[in-house]
């Protein structure tokens, strides 16, 4: 996922540069540093202020979840549910002010205590809302372009990556795609999960491990050709060592071999997962609570976080 601390300053910097096109290179560098350090100073529009409000609500929620981590189970669950309810109330207030605060809407949906099908329905409505806005109102955005940006938008040094990070609605849309893909995977809608994850993977400059969702889905579908075709693409893009260290690839390969009734190779693949991934064996043997993704799969803070995420998603 892309942190608000990355895309909100990029958006604010873009707005400032659009209204001050004649800044020198030195002034642009100073602006970049100042916006990153003091984003509130540049949040002059309702949308910008809504984005910062969202960041504040989310940061507070994550800090509080860290604080209560060592509470006894009953007290933890009660406190967590209260925190979720309070955060959702705050997020809904933001959404009432700004219908384009996509991440705020997404997190509000995730925090709602609704059945899977109802949650998926809400996420799909949000995805359509964000997509319609991007197609109709964002110059240069193109669903059919290789990385969602038409060539006409890639001028004056702009890249697909720089345009993506500076468009909060696009970032929110990508987060929504990932959330849908993960919920589809968790509810055994494997083809849909893979399809939504691939759409998130298409973006450039957007940090994501959505390839793991696709690999797990293809393994569940016993799609051997599709699995190894994607593995080859990832190997070419990132290098063989990074693929071989991916908990999602190693675990999905074990699942695929097991479902294909190749028991000995499956056991070897599972041992490789346990040996190569820190915490892999522990999480396989000890199902451990994982804080819900808020709103999507977070960057790891500890070396074993990736193995924990992969096992949780594959369960």
Name these PLM-found stretches.
Residues 10-11, 48, 52-62, 107, ...:
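"A position-specific structural signal for the A-helix of alpha-solenoid helical repeats
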Residues 49-55, 250-315:
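Long, ordered, amphipathic alpha-helical scaffolds
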């Amino acid at each position: 996922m892309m942190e608000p601390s990355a895309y909100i300053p990029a958006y604010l910097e873009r707005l400032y540069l659009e209204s001050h096109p004649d800044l020198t290179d030195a002034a642009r560098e100073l602006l970049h540093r100042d916006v990153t350090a003091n984003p509130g100073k540049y949040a002059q529009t309702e949308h910008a202020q809504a984005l910062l409000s969202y960041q504040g609500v989310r940061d507070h929620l994550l800090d509080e979840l860290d604080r209560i981590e060592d509470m006894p189970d009953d007290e933890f669950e009660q406190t967590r549910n209260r925190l979720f309810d309070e955060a959702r109330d705050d997020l809904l207030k933001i959404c009432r002010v700004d219908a384009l605060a996509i991440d705020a809407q997404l997190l509000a949906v995730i925090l709602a205590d609704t059945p899977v099908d109802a949650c998926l329905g809400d996420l799909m409505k949000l995805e359509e809302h964000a997509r319609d806005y991007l197609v109709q109102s964002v110059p240069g955005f193109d669903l059919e372009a290789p990385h969602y940006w038409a060539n006409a938008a890639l001028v004056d040094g702009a890249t697909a990556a720089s345009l993506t990070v500076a468009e909060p609605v696009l970032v929110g849309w990508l987060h929504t795609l990932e959330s849908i893909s993960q919920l589809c995977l968790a509810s055994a809608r494997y083809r849909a999960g893979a399809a939504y994850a691939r759409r998130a993977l298409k973006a450039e400059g957007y940090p994501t491990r959505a390839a793991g969702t696709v690999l797990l889905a293809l393994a569940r579908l016993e799609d051997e050709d599709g699995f190894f075709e994607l593995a080859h693409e990832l190997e070419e893009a990132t290098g063989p060592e990074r693929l071989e260290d991916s908990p999602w690839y190693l675990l999905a390969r074990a699942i695929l071999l097991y479902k294909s009734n190749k028991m000995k190779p499956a056991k070897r693949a599972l041992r490789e997962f346990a040996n190569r991934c820190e915490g892999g064996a522990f999480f396989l043997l000890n199902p451990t609570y994982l804080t819900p993704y808020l709103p999507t799969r977070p960057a790891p803070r500890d070396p074993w976080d990736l193995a924990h995420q992969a096992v949780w998603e594959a369960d």
